[in-house]
Amino acid sequence: QSSNIWGDKTDTVAIGTVIVYTKQKWIDFVLEVDAYANDNDGMGIVWRFKDLKEHYRFFTMIDSGNPPNGERGPWRKLEVRLGKGAGEKLPFYKTLDTEKGKSYTQGQLTHWKIDVAGDRFTVEVDGKKALEGKDNRYKEAGYIGFTLYAQSGVFFDNLVLTDTFPVDPRVAFTTTWGKIKQQHIAK
């Protein structure tokens, strides 16, 4: 991604751009990916993404001059979008956890690992625990994707996504195959 999109003029939080994979939805998972940025602005991962107003995100930024009127970098954050609820101020996020003074290193590969299990979220950066949060606002399965803010060149590689949502054994493939065998294969 190299569009260098910031968001709306009125944004005091980094909105930028989002790209999501829409062929499948996930609830619980472990996602690992390598990220490389030519710029020092915001980037991260979104999950349980329903739309621009309902999702979670891991977001990190180096730049101390962005966003305008917002919190200065460097930092890493775990956030929940406040959604469409009555009385919610939009387009704001609620911060679940922050690691101030740390982000990524511009021009160097960074490895992220996001573990999402129910209402608990853990982020590791380069093999070290960075953020931890808990929230139950969005419980349903949603899309997973990337979010960028004012970046002029970001690359993601070596993506591994492991679905950890428990399978109902009554409808699992092996159970279903066992039932078919019982019904249709003579003893």
PLM feature spans:
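Secretory/extracellular carbohydrate-interaction modules
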Residues: I5, K9-G87
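Beta-strand-rich interaction surfaces with strong enrichment in secreted/lumenal proteins
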Residues: T17-Q24, D97-Y104, G145-F146
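Surface-exposed coil/turn segments at beta-strand junctions on protein surfaces, enriched
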Residues: Y21-W26, N38, Y104-G107, V116, ...
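Short tryptophan-centered beta-strand motifs in secreted/extracellular beta-sheet-rich domains
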Residues: L31-V33, T105-V125
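Beta-strand signatures of extracellular beta-sandwich domains
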Residues: G44-V46, T122-E124, V160
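Short, aromatic/His-centered strand-loop micro-motif at the edge of beta-sheets
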Residues: G85-K113
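Short, solvent-exposed beta-strand-to-loop segments that form ligand-recognition rims
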Residues: D119, E124-T147
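Ligand-recognition surfaces built from glycine- and aromatic
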Residues: R137-A186
